[in-house]
Amino acid sequence: VNTPTLSGEAVLPPTTSIPSTIQGLGAVVSRRHFFRYLHDRHGSAFTVNLPVFGPSVVISDAAMARELFTAGDQVENVQPNLGRILGTGSMFALEGARHRARRKLLTPPLHGKPIRSYEQMVVDEVRAESASWPTGIEFASIEPMMRITLNVILRAVFGAEGSELDRLRDMIPPMVTVGSRAATVPPLPRLLRPIDPNHRYARRNAEYRAYVGGLITKARNDSHLDERTDILAIMLRSTYDDGSPMTDDEIAEELATMLAAGHETTATTLAWALERLRRHPEVVRELVAEVDAGGSDYRHATILEVQRSRPVIDFAGRHVVADHLDLGEWRIPKGYNVLVSIALLHDDSSEFARPEVFDPTRFLGTKPPSAWLPFGGGTRRCIGAAFATMEMDVTLRTLLADFELMPTSARSERWFSRGVAYAPSRGGRIAVVPR
């Protein structure tokens, strides 16, 4: 083990003697296993050299995570981030005052009464998708969940119906899939363009921008714009504190951000929820009884526990832009990324008793602790968290009301990286019988 001291007074957490090339291979092939190995050897903070992210400090200590998320202007968003592929107008790419202004503008339509108005839309999409499910025959749930969350977000964000909805439904999934891969791969040399996901994403994004530009123009000219409840219409009606509106480019990039951040992650969490519930029939019995009685507390706790035990996002990170950042006993120099390992933190027995046990009751009657981070933390906490939670809650409520979820004795499904999100390796297989 080597604990390096850099020029000045910078002191980094322990690093590994594993060569950088092997570190990179471990991070690419199985990042979570690699981080677990380093955590078991070096503790809750260690230094690595990662592909794409470069020199990075990985932490899994709740107190240090709180320090990081309240570090203010000493840090910016982790580099690189999804803003690299979504565009400079995406909230992922914005910093400082511009980020705060955009967040203030977009928070109202994604919280409270506006999102409750979408609940029936979720019910309708769940029932339309599940109407053709086979009875008693096992199938992977992740693709149906993807279709449900895609349809919901396209209708809620764009107000799309009919041919517009069909066109977006064809266009968005391949764009999100290749974008997830591009986010984890640096741009390749020109010679390798045919296999470069960044190049493929650029083509898909150009098609998206051209089509969505037309939808924005159409919405702006809609004589009923003031009556519309979709997020595109709300963006067009909204202004910053200085009275200026969002530009068309900003709107297009922010809509793409919502699709990228809110579609795949929500669907993947739902697939994990179904995977977990099949292996815990006692939890399902409690959930069904609660649904039949019109309650929701145990279901909400179950969603929190799914997100704790099966976080779909690897980390919440920041990039040090000050001369250095003091974090616990460490002094991290400018240019480093600091990554909070969500999976490691959620498995910390000092934060969550018996973390290996799937136990929704740990969240009954209490708010999640600060160590619970499926949506990230600080000023960059997922702005769509309330929308995603509503969508997961209504989806599970509807499925449990309509179907009996058949239990299984099969082994738990393993993690599988889909690029940005970690999904069940067999797609969250389920079997159902109509109630």
Residue map of PLM features:
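Conserved cytochrome P450 K-helix E-x-x-R motif and the immediately C-terminal K′/meander segment
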Residues: 24-43, 293-328, 349
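Conserved cytochrome P450 K-helix/beta-meander segment immediately N-terminal to the heme-binding cysteine loop
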Residues: 340-366
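N-terminal membrane-proximal hinge/A-helix region immediately C-terminal to the signal-anchor transmembrane segment
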Residues: 1-95, 101, 116, 123-128, ...
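Cytochrome P450 heme-thiolate monooxygenase catalytic core
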Residues: 2-12, 76-83, 98, 114-268
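Cytochrome P450 I-helix active-site segment
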Residues: 11-18, 119, 123, 170-174, ...
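Cytochrome P450 catalytic-core helices
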Residues: 263-290, 385-403
